[in-house]
């Protein structure tokens, strides 16, 4: 890697296009989806533990599933008309779609969903920025949240990983120290 080139430069990232296609100018990351076993448990976690709001709920009775869109938006600004509320929800950035297939919450045979962190590996985690990783983790500990990694565990100090009720991993880092955590790799 050339010293004058940043790690983000096209010279250091074969395949990276520098001219963004005009047709994609309005695109943005809107959501990621988790399949959940029990909406009562997951909604409690994402709202009470992580502080998200329910932006929109969509039910599909014919197909027996519901979608719960969670995010950090101020819902007092959301339209009350159901169609307008859906349009508003899909205009928000970085939301989580919780998908519940009806009946899984009471099915004793249901084993849960694969979170991507065991073989075969795939999806890994989502990331949440917090004001202070240590204070957030102390709160999560008091709430009984399961940890994958606490802030001082392992080689990367100051970041943590928790699990949601379905075993999906959530990385936690704070905006004040994330630059220091990744400094040697920047």
Swiss-Prot record:
Substrate binds at residues 31, 35, 101, 121, 125, 155-156. Its EC number is 4.4.1.5. Zn(2+) binds at residues 31, 97, 125, 171. SUPFAM superfamilies: Glyoxalase/Bleomycin resistance protein/Dihydroxybiphenyl dioxygenase. The active site is at residue 171. It catalyses: (R)-S-lactoylglutathione = methylglyoxal + glutathione. Pathway: Secondary metabolite metabolism; methylglyoxal degradation; (R)-lactate from methylglyoxal: step 1/2. Its cofactor is Zn(2+). Binds 1 zinc ion per subunit. Residues 28-175 form the VOC domain. Keywords: Lyase, Metal-binding, Zinc. Pfam families: Glyoxalase (PF00903). The keyword Repeat does not apply. GO terms for molecular function: lactoylglutathione lyase activity; metal ion binding. PANTHER family: LACTOYLGLUTATHIONE LYASE, LACTOYLGLUTATHIONE LYASE GLYOXALASE I. NCBIfam families: glyox_I. Catalyzes the conversion of hemimercaptal, formed from methylglyoxal and glutathione, to S-lactoylglutathione. Belongs to the glyoxalase I family. This is Lactoylglutathione lyase. It comes from Cicer arietinum. The lineage of its organism: Eukaryota, Viridiplantae, Streptophyta, Embryophyta, Tracheophyta.
